[in-house]
Amino acid sequence: ARKKDTDVIALWPSLNGGTVLSADNQTFSTANVHAAISRAKANNFGNQLYIIHHPNAVAELSKASATTADTAAAAGLTNGWSVDLLQNFYSGLRPINGVSIFEDGNIGKISTTDSGYGVIADKTAMAALNSVDTRTERQRDASLRATEVVMTADYGVFELDDSRGAAFRAEIGDLSFS
């Protein structure tokens, strides 16, 4: 699952011809999130928008926000999302302008900076195609005196409609305790 996740994340900076919203040293603030949402709506990204970003970026937003809730049900996960599948990734923030925000801890830092690429997109921007579902096999390795668990899957991830999303750059470094 992590491999598939990182394959999808790697496509985000290419969305919309490489358009990146925000920049290095910019926090995932309410103002920046509103700017990204308004840009997405003004440029016809679609009607089922979502944002995915690193938990540290989302924490920065929730720290400054008075609209937090503790569960997907309490926060009202936007209609059309499968709560049972996504509640563990849902940030718990009430949707901002109707846009749900999800967290993904697999988003990595961009080279030597503390920022990372999240995404704002419509549900029709990207697709995953599975030709073989995940299979788990056990393989005995006598030299290690162990049994390895091998997982395989055959899938592809790709941009379905490039114009329906854009990368969203923000700081993802650890928050301070002060």
Question: What do these predicted regions represent?
Answer:
Residues 1-43, 47, 169-178:
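Alpha-helical scaffold segments that mediate packing/assembly in large oligomeric complexes
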Residues 7-22, 53-63, 94, 100-105:
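Internal, well-folded beta-alpha domain core
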Residues 16, 25, 32, 43-47, ...:
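Detector for Asparagine
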Residues 21, 29-39, 57, 63, ...:
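Aromatic-enriched hydrophobic runs in primary sequence
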Residues 32-73:
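Hydrophobic, aromatic-enriched interface-forming segments
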